[in-house]
Amino acid sequence: MTRTLRITYSLSFLGLLVGMGAWSTGGLQSFQRTEQMTLLNGKLAKAAETHYDAEFPIKRLGTNVWAAMDFKLFNEGRPGVVLGRDQWLFSDEEFKPTAGAEQLMQENLALIRGVRDTLQQHGSQLVLAIVPAKARVYTEYLGKERPASLHDDLYNQFHAQARQANVFAPDLMAPMEQAKARGQVFLRTDTHWTPMGAEVAAQALAEAVSRQSLLNGDPQAFITEAGNTAPYKGDLTNFLPLDPLFSNLLPAPDNLQKRTTRPVDAEGDAGDALFADKQIPVALVGTSYSANPHWNFLGALQQALRSDVANYAEDGHGPLLPMLKYLQSDAFKNAAPQVVVWEFPERYLPMKNDLSSFDPQWIAQLKNSRKSEENLALSSTRTDH
């Protein structure tokens, strides 16, 4: 290597280092200091370090490049998503096996029984809304990766055990399969159902409630209004960190039409509320399928049941924890509803729950309800839809 070439190489390398260093400082440009951040308490340095790590340009570059290689070469995303056909994405919770699944299912079924008994003691009827997995409803869009054997018959097993435990659980799978001819019941890039899918489920539940005559009182009319349709980036795209360098590789966004539901006589009810404390006859408990207003499941349920519904669903905590919190709430203890709709995605049955925030003795009492002597081995019963 000649002297000139060595100098050129050294200067080029030095220029590259300076350029990369200058580029990397861009991560600090958007940092904003608050009054609580000082050099003395160390909060300023810690906050700057955290912000810089999150906004580090080279880190974003590496993340984007690595994700693009996984996506294009191996048709894979980050843990959390499974890639299907025709830009369909699925939650890996509907695919992966679970260690100790049999024991977890037995424990969760025991809790479901205990919930049913607690509600009955307060004069409330449980309606268990088992939501079929998106991967079960849209098997035609599955790719090379298939759900573990644990999930093969999970929906039917869940329903069989509910019947054996005398838990009222209307079927939602058949109505959803039939509704696919009219439109999507699950979002292509998201874990959740569409507003149409939520409406189909609500109508099926309402028909079952009506057949059993579970609601008393005068019906209340509701109306649902459709809003604008806009592109919607589903939650499963968060496991494909291709943005911003390779955003063109991302699946196209879904189209989501906003729906809102209101009482037909909303103004009259508002006036009546000044003079009367009206007890709401139905409670809804569940997951983000119920809590997120994007899907309008609450509104669809109100319109289908022709009844006001109080929503106690929570986002990000699964179906069991919100129900246990509801059973301990003053709202339930002081004014138990006639019907409690418990939205429960099937994939949560074999999942472990962190119940450390609840009294262990109370949890044990729920698990050892009056039906605890029944054998609920999931392998004992098989049914069809």
From Swiss-Prot:
Q: To which pathway does this protein belong?
A: Glycan biosynthesis; alginate biosynthesis
- In this protein, the active site sits at 190, 192 (proton acceptor), 288 (nucleophile)
Q: Which UniProt keywords apply?
A: Acyltransferase, Alginate biosynthesis, Cell inner membrane, Cell membrane, Membrane, Periplasm, Signal, Transferase
From which domain of life does this come?
Bacteria
* InterPro entries per record: AlgJ, ALGX/ALGJ_SGNH-like
Topology with respect to the bilayer: Peripheral membrane protein
Its EC number(s): 2.3.1.-
- What EC class does the entry list? transferase
Annotated GO CC locations:
periplasmic space; plasma membrane
User: Secretion signal: which residues?
Assistant: 1-21
- MF-aspect GO terms: acyltransferase activity
Where does it localize?
Cell inner membrane; Periplasm
- Which biological process terms from the Gene Ontology are attached to this UniProt entry? alginic acid biosynthetic process
Q: What is its main location?
A: membrane
Report which residue ranges the record marks as coiled coil: none
**The keyword Transmembrane is annotated on this UniProt entry:** no
Similarity comment text for this entry: Belongs to the AlgJ family.
Role of this protein: Together with AlgI and AlgF, forms an inner membrane complex which probably interacts with the alginate polymerization-transport complex and adds acetyl groups at the O-2 and O-3 positions of mannuronate residues. Acetylation of alginate is important for the architecture of biofilms and increases the ability of alginate to act as a defense barrier.
Q: What is this protein called?
A: Probable alginate O-acetylase AlgJ
